[in-house]
């Protein structure tokens, strides 16, 4: 599909939303940590939207008491919707096309990774009913059936993609909305609940965890994968670390904080893995963000005038010129992964927790 008509159609609405400035998309700034309540906060980093380059500046604060990282001030619901729109205009995917960009950056979850997730839970249980939260197009449930053929998979997602997933047969049942809002309706229905890189984008991860506990039967398992803000890549790359993902990530939770909250809610952690969930894309992702920040911006709906053909041509040429460097960075990501994940560079963790009785 040609992108230009979509950009033209979106321009008036986008400019109207920005007429009062991007500050309107932020809630009041917090003076305490949303995780532990401590007032001991420090600014960890400030960033612009490095992927889409929409207007605005975003701050990640870190709590000195519990090390929780959170966007402060946080985006409002309207702001989150604004910055998550226009997925076809995401940096390298727009400049090189989605298939090549995903291959060079190594960010798309592979079939092997999905199967490994299912196998990780199968060690503890072969669930009868599994709910995948934030399922999107439901690729995980569709693939997990290969190793869990007797499990019924349902999906939950706020977007229309969940309806397509039901029609295509990737999930048995689809729930559109958020888990905190739907949890009472789903109470006690599932033996397993999964959240893969879902909590970081949630306004309130604690409510998501409460919803997961409510949806699970006693003895059921919760599987979580999340970006690890304590990894060495996060400190080395700073703003350019793809795991920061501003403004889309609202929370980055240290593993200890998540484990403590799971225990408080009545879970027993049965497995933790900081190696297998690693996505080998840090160097390539950081390079792509740097390239994107220096190229002329393409034809986007948040600029008042359409981009001239020359500017669009220069942008495409710049992306194609960067392909050899991106390919080299991707190769290094993959080659170094076995070593780096043993030395604190793993960029994600996986937690499997069992809901206690009662």
Where are these regions (language model features)?
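Conserved N-terminal segment of class I S-adenosyl-L-methionine
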Residues: 2-196, 205-211, 274-275, 342-358
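A transmembrane-helix-recognition feature enriched in membrane-embedded lipid enzymes
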Residues: 313-346
